[in-house]
From Swiss-Prot:
UniProt family annotation: Belongs to the prokaryotic GSH synthase family.
Any single GO CC term annotated in Swiss-Prot or TrEMBL for this entry: cytoplasm
Gene Ontology MF terms: ATP binding; glutathione synthase activity; metal ion binding
NCBIfam families: glut_syn, PRK05246.1
Protein's name in the database: Glutathione synthetase
Database matches in SUPFAM superfamilies: Glutathione synthetase ATP-binding domain-like, PreATP-grasp domain
Gene source species: Bordetella pertussis (strain Tohama I / ATCC BAA-589 / NCTC 13251)
Cofactor: Mg(2+); Mn(2+)
Keyword list, A-Z: ATP-binding, Glutathione biosynthesis, Ligase, Magnesium, Manganese, Metal-binding, Nucleotide-binding
Annotated EC: 6.3.2.3
InterPro entries, per database record: ATP-grasp, ATP_grasp_subdomain_1, Glut_synth_pro, GSHS_ATP-bd, GSHS_N, PreATP-grasp_dom_sf
One Pfam family this sequence matches: GSH-S_N
Length: 318
């Protein structure tokens, strides 16, 4: 297969721990050809969705901590997305309007015969914070609003809550508001931009000290290990980008129940790869844009997550 990755600039990736790079390694090892494009390389001309792209290969034995782990194998070119055997959307959030426009282009490309994973419509229809509202029986009490009075009432009722923006990643903009929080109003004014920006509030889950678990669904199947991202002392965010420590562990019975319930519900929606965030017994996010933790789980357990993704992509792309 010729696989196109729509991805952030390669020099900016931390290749040694980047899940997209791990995917590329697995696909290249299985004999597939790789190309990359940036989000801004997508365009429509005369009704056809096309992209500028660069064919690449990963260097054998390269130090992934350096900057020469990949090489271009030919001149940059342009082609319709439908010409590739598979298009893998791996652009990281924020999920801004440019991202939304990209999902529309990907959806149009699919209508023209492109095979896109995750599909443009599926990414757009499952915003990562909001998607949990489809599963109220699997989540902690949750409120989505920009009404500061409503958030204050929710906080008063729950006593200890987490508030966060809907369109960020890596733990950015997340606050814990305990009952006696003296800066409650200032935090809400900032996050909601004085009541003009919708945010999410959730009852605090004390099991965060044991880790914010990332559970991966690939081709509708739960991977047997999660990565528990354990917060630094004094932190409420387990995200690795916020300094959390990742510890791989087998799925518990509850984890497996959550994963299978979500997988069954999402079946047939164009989501080849999903990352569930689980704290305690509850799902806190459903990640569909650029789920990570492939490398950490593989290195700690020996279970080859990138290989599983490559096999699933081959099957899905036909």
């Amino acid at each position: 297969m010729h696989v196109l990755f729509i991805i952030d600039p390669l020099p900016l990736l931390k290749a040694y721990k980047d899940s997209s790079v791990a995917m590329m390694q697995a696909l290249q090892a299985r004999g597939h050809t790789l190309s990359v494009a940036l989000q801004g390389d997508l365009y429509i001309d005369a009704g056809e969705v096309r992209t500028r792209f660069a064919p690449i290969a990963l260097r054998d034995g390269a130090d992934l901590h350096g900057h020469d782990w990949w090489r271009e194998t030919g001149a940059a070119d342009e082609a319709p997305l439908a010409r590739f055997d598979a298009v893998v959307m791996r652009k990281d959030p924020p999920f801004d309007m440019e991202y939304v426009y990209s999902t529309h282009l990907l959806e149009y490309a699919q209508q023209q015969g492109a095979r896109v994973f995750n599909s443009g419509a599926a990414i757009r229809n499952h915003p990562e914070k909001l998607a949990i509202t489809e599963f109220p029986d699997l989540t902690t009490p949750t409120l989505v609003t920009r009404d500061m009075a409503r958030i204050r009432a929710f906080h008063a009722a729950q006593g200890d809550v987490i508030v966060k923006p809907l369109d960020d990643m890596g733990g950015t903009g997340i606050f814990r508001l305990q009952r006696s929080e003296p800066n409650l109003n200032a935090i809400l004014e900032t996050l909601t931009d004085n009541g003009t920006r919708t945010i999410m509030a959730q009852r605090y889950i004390p099991e965060i000290v044991k880790g914010d678990k990332r559970i991966l669904l690939i081709g509708g199947e739960p991977m047997p290990y999660s990565l528990a991202r354990i917060p630094l002392a004094g932190e409420t965010r387990g995200n690795l980008a916020a300094g959390g420590r990742g510890v791989a562990q087998p799925l518990s019975e509850r984890d497996l129940h959550l994963a299978r319930t979500v997988a069954d519900r999402l079946a047939g929606r164009g989501l080849l790869l999903v990352g569930l965030d689980v704290i305690g017994d509850y799902i806190t996010e459903v990640n569909v844009t650029s789920p990570t933790c492939f490398v950490e789980i593989t290195e700690q357990t020996g279970f080859n997550v990138p290989e599983m993704f490559a096999v699933a992509l081959e099957s899905a792309a036909g």
